[in-house]
Each structure stands twice: as structure tokens, then as C-alpha cells.
A protein has these predicted regions:
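Phosphate-binding beta-loop-alpha motif at adenosine-nucleotide cofactor sites
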Residues: 80-85, 144-153, 249
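Internal, conserved structured core segments that host functional sites
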Residues: 113-115, 119-169, 173, 194-195
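A generic structural motif
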Residues: 11, 149-150, 208
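Extreme N-terminus of proteins, especially the signal/transit-peptide cleavage junction
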Residues: 1-3, 346-347
């Protein structure tokens, strides 16, 4: 069996460091590992419209933003197929068929759906399209016969629901769909990066993000304003590193080589944490170190983005060709699905037979 990856992001804004450590960095590593035969990276504009139906221009404008961030992070169109979701109409048909295999109560129990509904204040006014997006996501994954899906921790319930749909379809119609495996970040701190305000999730809608394309000054301003340990009021006070966003970011981004370069009085992150915990280390010093770490990590990404911004027609062509390639694959899967369901009526003359 071919080893295939499918993953993607909603184009509702520029991508941030939460996206990067949550899945983008892992995608690039998997792409360059040589272990996968095909890699599909989807810009999920149709999914973005489920809660932006009245603002399609917002979605349209961010297609290129997300594509630029992808290329800047190291996704290579020679190795990965970058495409736009709405350009693949087969995904809509697959979603429609899968809806018959999922109950309303099952979608309501999905923790990710419940959290998103609460965050967007939808409650009883939730759009049907948004409510059904776990089913749409299952169509996205199965259409490309993905064997592996690298995701952040918050998407784990979605992948579990996708696997349920695959199992149900195969049980009813025969072994047709590929059962995908979930790939989570290895670094625990990368599972979910909190917002700079200390909230549990970094979110564009909450305005608590550090974007991959932020200027050096924007990064510095955001880091220096970050929420820390509220009990660490004075430098001499003992502080908590657990649950402290500044240290969570350091866990996610810091490398051993950054200490000799930026904070040579410490041998490593463990020593820095120990000093903070016993007291005598101020938040400003730790934040300055984090700023240096993030500047070093994000500078090459920002430079590559600026280079691609000068080649927008090339980016457009990458998406156009990628969407054509993706559609061919999805069309093949849809033919298999229709055959398994015995609704490929005009593929042979069996429709003329009387049972």
C-alpha cells in the first residue's frame, strides 16, 4: 500500500507559531523523510466558509497568505501537492454519502465541535455546514487515501470520528476506504501552544497569536507582553514554569545551541527553569531570551516568504496544478465509493437487469 499524507489549514488568516509547532514543522520533516509516496496539503477554503459565509472575501484573500506560509516553512511543490479544497467537487459528494453513516448525537459529542461552537458563540444558531465539518474532514482524508494525518492535539477527536466513518463504510459496503493513522507532534509542548495572553488556545479570532510573518519588532512586542506566572510578582519570588506560556514556548522552540549564543550563564533550559523556580530570576530576562530564540527561528521563514511574495504568479501556478492533481485522485476514490455503494449506474448494463 502506498504511504500517503493528507493535512491542511483553514485560510482565515496568516498562519502562526501554533500552526508551525503543532503540525507544519512535522509536515516538512515527513515530506523530507522520503518515507511517503504522496503528500497532499489542502487549503481548506470550503471548511473556512462554514463560519465565514458572509465574508467570502476574507477567505479568498487568505488563500495566498496560507500558500506563502506553506512555502516559507519549507513545503516543496516538487514533493508535496498543494491544492484548494473547493476546487475538488468530489469532496462534496463524498461528504453527502458519509452523512448517512453518522448520527447528529455523535457529532454533538465531538469535543472539538463543542469547543469550537462555544468559542464562536454559535449555540443554537450553529450553521449546518459548520456542524457537519467533521464529516467533511473525513471526506477530505479518505478522498486521497491518506494513510497518515499529522495534526495538532485539538484535531484528535476529528480524526477519531473519521476512523469511525471509515470502519462503518467498510462494514456496510465492503473494504473500500483506507483507515488513516494519526501523527501527533513528539514534543509535548507542541501539542497545543497557548496564546500569548495565557488562554488555552492560540487563535486568530482571539488576537493572541505570534504570526510566522510578523516583523522582528512585532515579535518582540508580543513576547514582552506575554502572560507569565501571576504569583511571580518580584524577581526574588519563586516562580512556576509549568503552565507558564513563556516556558511552554521555550520548551517548543529552544535548542541547546541558543544558550551559548543568547544566555551563556546557563547550561540549558533545565538550569534556567530551576533558577526561576527557586526565585531570583525576573520575567523580563526570560522573555528577552525567548524573543532571541523566536527571532532566530522565524527569520529564515520570514525571508523565504518575502522571496515567494516576489513570485506570486508562480505560487498561483503551484496551486492550480496541485488542484488538478488532487482532483484526479479524489475522482478515482469517488468512483470506488460509488461502485461499492452500487450507485455507479451507467458503468455497466446491470441496471437493465430485473432482480
Amino acid at each position: 500500500m502506498k504511504q500517503i499524507i493528507l493535512t491542511g489549514d483553514r485560510p482565515t488568516g496568516r498562519l502562526h507559531v501554533g500552526h508551525y509547532v503543532g503540525s507544519l514543522k512535522e509536515r516538512v520533516a515527513l515530506q523530507n523523510s522520503g518515507k511517503f509516496d504522496e503528500i497532499y496539503i489542502m487549503i481548506a477554503d470550503a471548511q473556512a466558509l462554514t463560519d465565514n459565509a458572509e465574508h467570502p472575501e476574507k477567505v479568498r484573500q487568505n488563500i495566498m497568505n496560507v500558500a506563502l506560509d506553506y512555502l516559507a516553512c519549507g513545503l516543496d511543490p516538487e514533493k508535496s501537492t498543494l491544492f484548494i479544497q473547493s476546487m475538488i467537487p468530489e469532496l462534496t459528494e463524498l461528504t453527502f454519502y458519509y452523512m448517512n453513516l453518522v448520527t447528529v448525537s455523535r457529532v454533538q459529542r465531538n469535543p472539538t465541535v463543542k469547543a469550537e461552537i462555544q468559542m464562536r458563540n454559535f449555540e443554537a444558531s450553529i450553521p449546518v455546514g459548520f456542524f457537519c465539518y467533521p464529516i467533511s474532514q473525513a471526506a477530505d482524508i479518505t478522498a486521497f487515501r491518506a494513510t497518515a494525518v499529522p495534526v495538532g492535539e485539538d484535531q484528535l477527536p476529528m480524526l477519531e470520528q473519521c476512523k469511525e466513518i471509515v470502519h462503518k463504510f467498510n462494514a456496510v459496503y465492503g473494504d473500500t476506504l483506507v483507515d488513516p493513522q494519526i501523527i501527533l507532534p513528539k514534543n509535548q509542548a507542541c501539542l497545543r501552544l497557548p496564546g500569548i495572553d495565557g488562554k488555552a488556545k492560540m487563535s486568530k479570532s482571539l488576537g493572541n497569536c505570534i504570526y510566522l510573518s510578523d516583523s522582528p519588532e512585532d515579535i518582540r512586542t508580543k513576547v514582552m507582553s506575554m502572560f507569565t506566572d501571576p504569583t511571580h510578582l518580584r524577581r526574588e519570588d519563586p516562580g512556576h514554569t509549568e503552565g507558564n506560556p513563556v516556558f511552554i514556548y521555550l520548551d517548543a522552540f529552544c535548542r541547546p545551541e541558543y544558550f551559548p549564543e543568547f544566555l551563556s550563564e546557563y547550561s540549558g533550559l533545565d538550569e534556567l527553569k530551576a533558577h526561576y523556580q527557586r526565585g531570583g530570576l525576573g520575567d523580563v530576562k526570560v522573555k528577552k531570551f525567548l524573543n532571541n530564540v523566536l527571532q532566530a527561528e522565524l527569520a529564515p521563514i520570514r525571508q523565504r516568504r518575502e522571496d515567494w511574495e516576489k513570485r506570486l504568479p508562480d505560487v498561483y501556478e503551484i496551486l492550480r496544478v496541485g488542484s488538478e492533481t488532487a482532483r484526479n485522485t479524489a475522482a478515482s476514490t469517488l468512483r470506488d465509493v460509488r461502485h461499492a455503494m452500487r450507485i455507479d449506474y451507467f458503468e455497466d448494463s446491470n441496471l437493465l437487469r430485473k432482480d
